Amino acid sequence: MSSWGDSLKISVFGESHGKGIGVVIDGLPAGVRLDMEGIYLQMSRRAPGKDKTATPRLEKDIPQVLSGLLDNTTTGAPLCAVIENTNTRSGDYGNIMSCPRPGHADYTGNIRYGGFNDISGGGHFSGRLTAPIVFAGSVCRQILAEKGIRIAAHIASIGNVNDIRFDPVDIPSELIDRLNVSTFALIDQSAEEKMRAEVEQCRMNLDSIGGTVECAVTGLPAGVGSPMFYGIEGVISSIVFGIPAVKGIEFGAGFDAAKMKGSQDNDEFYYDGDTVRTRTNNHGGILGGISSGMPVIFRAALKPTPSIGKQQNTVDLVKHQDAKLEIHGRHDPCIVPRAVPVIESAAAVAVANLMMQVNKL
């Protein structure tokens, strides 16, 4: 299924080398005026071909809205947007039609769909399909901003090079403003040179590298979410895992909480005026699947781009024998910088859906 959500539902369609890709967003409130330039800005942060850390495939990624918008204002009808694919080179994939690429969905997709799936550029499994997610998320984050809810993410790490983490109890609006327009989003900008060097070394060695993205949601009121299976962690995780390359996620202190004592992990409450807050935020803004009013913080791990220039071992599904494979085409040596606005957008869609569930949006 390429559809997600209940109160707010998105359906992503298209393939990497097809005529276009897009998304249908169903359940948006009517009468919301959208800043299209703001949406184009977020699309450009994800768009390929603009940085050495990214694929040289150049796409403008300008969404064409087909329905649900009149004079830049939502009508209440499903909002449908299409993004044209203008720079495809399917010939680069001729040698992989019968030889699945290690780390890709070529083999599993072949088995699942009986060999009828389009593998050019990764087909429907491609990271290109994150562009519609960014469009949907850009719409949602504008609606959330009217409620005082803001979302920002940054590159937490590339390889062994780390950025500093968000202050879990106090994320300044000035930092959110800066990260929201950055194409190489870092809290400590001095880490950029080392991160770029790490990526460049992999690129020169015909290899790739992964990393992590940290995301924060501020302004989410207490009381949003549900227990057990529809808690905030589950809702956010379910859409974040729809992003190709994401292999793990943690909230708050995450796996570090497993090393703590209860007296260390527990976040003590106090009154800040009339507002209940916690002095620490190991719980990442979520208790029992429900928001506490503190910033919601999570980190997602992204594996290295599987398409690399090194010769690799695979199999030939037609000849039923082992084979060697050299991958051609244009690929990201590191997907992490471009994944930042995608993670933000996935969080925005998830939070909008959660807010609608409790009639707060």
Predicted regions and their residues:
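N-terminal, positively charged regions that mediate nucleic acid binding
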Residues: M1-R57
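Short acidic, glycine/tyrosine-flanked loop/strand segments centered on an H-E-D-like triad
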Residues: M97-G123, V315-H331
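Glycine-rich, N-terminal phosphate-binding loop and its surrounding beta-alpha-beta segment
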Residues: Q42-T108
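A short glycine/serine-rich beta->alpha loop
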Residues: K9-G14, N117-L129, A222-S226, N281-L287, ...
